[in-house]
Amino acid sequence: MKNLFSNIIKNTCNCAIIILLTSATSFAADKVKLRLNWMYYGSHAGFALGFVDGTYEKHGIDIDIRSGNGSSSAHRLVANKDSHFSYGSCGAMTDLASKGAPIKSIGVIDAMGTEAILVRPDSGVKTIKDLKGKKILTTANAGVNTFFPIVLANAGLKESDVNITNVPDGALVSSYLQGSGGAVAILGGLDDKPAEIKANGGAQPIAFPYSDFGVNQVGYCIATHNDTIRNNPGLAKRFIRATMEAYAKAEKNPDAAVDAIADIVGGSMAEEAGRK
């Protein structure tokens, strides 16, 4: 498991975080709530490390990291001012902003999108058009859902050609491995789901990346409310500066980042890693 998360962290940290930087200044601690897209996984390791090792505290931020229920939900909570910042799919954020949500991206993690259709290798599916009439699993509020209709259209398919079924996020991979209800594929990220499938005994899935079908987009972004940008730009800059520092540390020391997640979620990951 530790190797799994270390690989995800290394892939995630080879990314761009884009934001304006200013000179170092002393700040009073601000209470900040960060909303993640899902429960903790490898791509979140920089946030976890920054919390555990005091990076955010050093930048005057008292951070409260909350798990989420999908990218759309995470960004929506920022738009509703439940949370100060969100981490999730840029596609989901763009979709919400286009509908009037008062949010903007202030930073990018994973500059290249990782969204894909992941297919069981024993399904007989060789091309994306072979998915016609097949069942595909996903989770409600997942950012990967946003541009799936465009992928289908660019491949010469209609939404009605496939059977999309929502399952809980925690059951997505297990349902895929069991072929639940005849499912042959899931919608997910190349940055974590293939590794999770293999870690649970599954074979390497066949991948149809969205980018192969005309959907080239930024992967995951950090978003905040327009009012934060307008009224407290210094906080936004400090948050991104601290995040950049934390992810740089995670890239240099992925084991520490994995341990930081373990510290937060209760140590089960660290215990399993210790048996490796």
List each model region and its residues.
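Secondary-structure end/capping motifs
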Residues: 231-276
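Bacterial N-terminal signal peptides that target proteins for export
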Residues: 2-16
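Second-shell loop/turn segments in exported
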Residues: 135-138, 181-183, 227-229, 244-250
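Short, glycine-/small- and polar/acidic-enriched structural segments
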Residues: 28-175, 180-191, 208-210, 216
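N-terminal signal peptide c-region/cleavage motif recognized by signal peptidases
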Residues: 23-25
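Periplasmic-binding protein-like
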Residues: 109-119, 202-228, 236, 240, ...
